Curated annotation (Swiss-Prot):
It comes from the Eukaryota. Disulfide bonds join 94-102, 115-135. GO terms for cellular component: cytoplasm; extracellular region; nucleus; sperm flagellum; sperm head. Expressed in epididymis, where it localizes to the proximal caput and also part of the midcaput. Not detected in other tissues tested. Pfam families: Cystatin (PF00031). Glycans are attached at residue 134. This is Cystatin-11. It is found in: Secreted. Residues 1-28 form the signal peptide. Keywords: Disulfide bond, Glycoprotein, Protease inhibitor, Secreted, Signal, Thiol protease inhibitor.
Length: 139
């Protein structure tokens, strides 16, 4: 009998701790919503430009890459915006020192990658930061 009541007490204590921890997390990050959004949204365009520029700055490749296809964009609204972006990017004919719109690389230098970016964004004050980046070769 005592063992049964001890198990019940431990279970109630575990539930109480879980509820307190959950309420603390809710207060810490006010989660409002997450939704799929269009690339035509103005803040999304700015975020995609930022992601492309940052990728090219940090890449060790001699050539710039550009977004070829947008696979998915999710917007998470909390105290700020967070975009979760999945894109296909392809190597261009422009070296890193060139900034004009360039053709896609063909032949031996052809390279296509799929990238996932998680981006912290406050677009109305032009603040962006890549929180996570994962790119893999797809060709």
């Amino acid at each position: 009998m005592a063992a049964g009541s001890w198990k019940a007490t431990r279970l109630l204590l575990a539930i109480l701790v879980a509820l307190v921890a959950f309420s603390y997390q809710v207060k810490r990050k006010t989660f409002i919503r997450i939704e799929e959004v269009s690339a035509l949204e103005s803040s999304v365009k700015e975020t995609l430009e930022y992601v492309t520029d940052e990728y090219n700055k940090k890449s060790e490749d001699l050539y710039n890459f550009r977004i070829l296809r947008i696979l998915k964009i999710m917007k998470q609204v909390t105290g700020h915006l967070e975009y979760h972006i999945t894109v296909e990017m392809q190597r261009t004919t422009c070296l890193k020192t060139e900034t004009s719109l360039c053709d896609i690389q063909k032949g031996e230098l052809h390279k296509k990658i799929q990238c996932y970016f998680s981006v912290y964004a406050i677009p109305w004050v032009e603040v962006f930061k890549i929180l996570k980046k994962n790119c893999t070769d797809i060709s």
